Amino acid sequence: MAELGNILLTLARNAIASRLGQPTQPVGDSPELHAPGATFVTLTQHGQLRGCIGSLEAWRPLGQDVRENALAAAFRDPRFDALGEEELPFTRVEVSLLTPAEAMNFTDEADALAQLRPGIDGVIFSVGNRRSTFLPQVWEQLPTPALFMAHLKQKAGL
């Protein structure tokens, strides 16, 4: 899995570098790249979010998914201006490979909070037409289930 992680990271970095006219690095191949996969690509600068775009479901080949999400995070995240060439050396790229979403069964909010596994679970929160998503790394900033869910609900506008 570490080898696949390095390949995905190189694909993401290469997609951004190529769009900016910068040199790219050699990248290996893996059968997993040709199977459907879902990724999120997160860009940070000095610990601050700079872009994050991804796919919640696997609907295209994994290699294509990571490249497209890297480009979208760098150049089309509506929260930020497009990444500039001068920013690239200071931009950290992270690729999250998602597993298929699983529905949670719970009786109330306390039951839902008790089922969450800090540092492991990402959550897709949906109520009516409101929806928000947190990846597992968000637990680093919101370490308790109560904080995690409160911010997730706020992000959904609830």
Which stretches of residues belong to each language-model region?
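Basic nucleic-acid-binding interfaces
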Residues: 1-158
